[in-house]
A protein has these predicted regions:
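N-terminal secretory signal peptides that target proteins for export/translocation
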Residues: 1-11
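Intrinsic structural disorder/low-complexity segments
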Residues: 13, 17, 134-135
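Bacterial N-terminal signal peptides
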Residues: 16-27
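Signal peptide processing junction and immediate N-terminal pro/mature segment
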Residues: 28-36
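Structured extracytoplasmic
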Residues: 35-189, 197-202, 207-225, 231-240, ...
Length: 302
């Protein structure tokens, strides 16, 4: 176990682990709605649906799409302030331009500093790529953990309500996990909601029903009630995460109190062409306004 991941990298309980893993679940649960629309009564068990989802997820090209969007985030990264940022996605990582803090636009001095930071990225793109690689490592770990879902959870209570499939999940007592991320994530219970027509996830939430402890609680404990939720929406034929909420409370390393919370809302999505360079992304994010390249969320529907 790497204790540094608990105290240094968003407590080791990364948003990508809590929200991202289940967003991947939602991206792959297409088979539920498709089967229902064609044959009526659900022909698959919940476990079969989850396994089919995992098999289909790698075939979905949507995760390669790039966007420009507006982000409002309060997290450890923002010093618990609400940051409003314009974000442009590239294959190498996300370029961010800070627009406001706690609802207040940047001063001229702050804006100059922000533009200087972006200029440094253009001057040293390799440094930017190196810094962004940690996030990509997290995503790779999330993909590995995704494959453990059929063993880690019991999925049940599948029902159709007003055109939305709903499914509950809770820990599988026969499963075993290693490391605090797996132990916390796979100790959660919750539910997912899936648009039956579009065959995409709309909402997912999970909550710890009891404490999760490492080293009899002396090394780390995540408290009962810690939770996450995530919402997705169809943006012109492209399904995107529009809200992620994470709230983790606990202690680590001999009773040190730990509290990690994040609240991220994304809007104003605009589809981008493939192959945008880091320099082009910086120019776009500094220019402001929507990106009207080959198409946007209203004009392009693949």
């Amino acid at each position: 176990m790497n204790l540094g991941s608990w105290s240094g990298r968003q407590s080791g309980l990364r948003v990508v682990m809590m929200g991202g893993i289940f967003l991947a679940v939602g991206a792959g649960l297409r088979c539920v709605g498709a089967q229902e629309a064609e044959v009526g009564p659900m022909p698959l068990t919940p476990l079969q649906v989850v396994k089919a989802m995992i098999a289909n997820e790698d075939d979905d090209p949507a995760h390669m799409d790039r966007y420009e969007f507006l982000s409002n985030e309060r997290s450890e990264r923002t010093g618990e302030h609400m940051w409003t940022e314009r974000v442009v996605e590239t294959a190498q990582g996300r370029i961010r331009f800070l627009l406001a803090v706690d609802g207040r636009p940047l001063s001229a001095e702050q804006e100059q500093k922000e533009r200087g930071r972006l200029a440094a990225i253009v001057a040293d793109p390799n440094g930017f790529v190196a810094r962004e690689s940690a996030q990509k490592d997290d995503e790779a770990q999330a993909r590995k953990m995704l494959n453990l879902l059929p063993q880690a959870f019991i999925f049940d209570n599948v029902r159709l309500e007003n055109g939305v499939w709903k499914m509950d999940f809770h820990p599988n007592p026969k499963s075993s996990q290693h490391g605090i991320e797996e132990r916390v994530l796979f100790a959660m219970s919750g539910s997912v909601a899936i648009d039956a027509k579009q065959e995409r996830i709309l909402h997912i939430e999970g909550r710890l029903p009891s404490d999760v402890s490492i080293g009899f609680g002396l090394l780390a404990t995540v408290r009962a009630g810690s939770h996450f939720s995530s919402d997705r929406a169809d943006k012109g034929g492209h399904w995107r995460t529009v809200h992620v909420l994470t709230a983790m409370q606990g202690k680590a390393i001999l009773f040190k109190s730990v509290s990690r919370e994040s609240d991220i809302t994304r809007s104003e999505f605009h589809y981008l062409d493939e192959g945008m360079t880091i320099a082009q992304a910086v120019a776009l994010v500094e220019a402001g306004g929507p990106a009207r390249t080959a198409g946007d969320e209203t004009a392009r529907n693949r």
